[in-house]
Amino acid sequence: MKQTTINHSVELVGIGLHKGVPVKLVLEPLGENQGIVFYRSDLGVNLPLKPENIVDTKMATVLGKDNARISTIEHLLSAVHAYGIDNLKISVDNEEIPIMDGSALTYCMLLDEAGIKELDAPKKVMEIKQAVEIRESDKFVKIEPDSQLSLNFTIDFNHPVIAKQAHHFVFSKTAYKEQVAKARTFGFLQEVNYLRSIGLAKGGSLNNCIVLDENSILNKEGLRCEKEFVCHKILDAMGDLMVLGMPVMGKYTSFSGSHKLNSMLVKAILADAKNYEVLIAADPAKEFALQKAFA
């Protein structure tokens, strides 16, 4: 398989979730071995996608370097991961990626519009060689060897609508677009009110978030699918795993995982070379599996 980028530049304008201000997003092609590079066009600062540049994971995954930050990168990166894009410039003129409808669906449509272009360099894939696990109280994230990417996620909320949900997702681009991309972020009305009181979630609304009160969903249209809550967590995890800089072959398992735990997992994987192998020229069986996944 070859490395990829996009065929041509595409752009959109949306609202940032926390600041609530318009943000212009531009995706541009990059050459081979350039990786994923974010760019603050208002500041003239490049922010390469690297684990050491992740500076905050409380409310979202935040990239930072010097005086520049870009927040809520995970939904766009999830789509980039699913489309198998290796090299891409992502420019924004403010400190957030636009939230759009709270899912990755808009970004999938944007990438479809841009098209995928092969480059004259072999694709790099990270194969997990031994289990790596991060725990925090009863919460955990874990990745272990597998011949494909699969994500097993369980959430458990003390809420009558969500309760306990689990989903086993075997990655393919097609399955991602059908099961995961449309799943929206969600939050609780009490938390939203608090966040707004401290100057956050100014761009949040029923148009870009599933909002729940104590007993029900406030969005009149309801859910897009039965497991939308846990599928959004899978969406987030795929975005956070993209911080590794390349597609991953491994079995990811999580119970009540978070951006924080995912970021810790990424750094733990890279901390020991025995945990992984970067496949430059995959053997025929593995290459066929990858081609099938990203078709």
UniProtKB/Swiss-Prot annotation:
Main enzyme class: hydrolase
Gene Ontology CC entries for this record: membrane
Species in which this protein is naturally found: Helicobacter pylori (strain ATCC 700392 / 26695) (Campylobacter pylori)
UniProt keywords, alphabetically: Hydrolase, Lipid A biosynthesis, Lipid biosynthesis, Lipid metabolism, Metal-binding, Zinc
Cofactor: Zn(2+)
Matching InterPro entries: Ribosomal_Su5_D2-typ_SF, UDP-acyl_GlcNac_deAcase, UDP-acyl_GlcNac_deAcase_C, UDP-acyl_N-AcGlcN_deAcase_N
GO biological process: lipid A biosynthetic process
Catalysed reactions, as listed in the record: a UDP-3-O-[(3R)-3-hydroxyacyl]-N-acetyl-alpha-D-glucosamine + H2O = a UDP-3-O-[(3R)-3-hydroxyacyl]-alpha-D-glucosamine + acetate
Protein function: Catalyzes the hydrolysis of UDP-3-O-myristoyl-N-acetylglucosamine to form UDP-3-O-myristoylglucosamine and acetate, the committed step in lipid A biosynthesis.
Active site location: 259
HAMAP family registered for this protein in UniProt: LpxC (MF_00388)
Gene: lpxC
Protein name: UDP-3-O-acyl-N-acetylglucosamine deacetylase
Family classification: Belongs to the LpxC family.
Functional pathway: Glycolipid biosynthesis; lipid IV(A) biosynthesis; lipid IV(A) from (3R)-3-hydroxytetradecanoyl-[acyl-carrier-protein] and UDP-N-acetyl-alpha-D-glucosamine: step 2/6
Cross-referenced Gene3D superfamilies: lpxc deacetylase, domain 1, lpxc deacetylase, domain 2
Molecular function terms from GO: metal ion binding; UDP-3-O-acyl-N-acetylglucosamine deacetylase activity
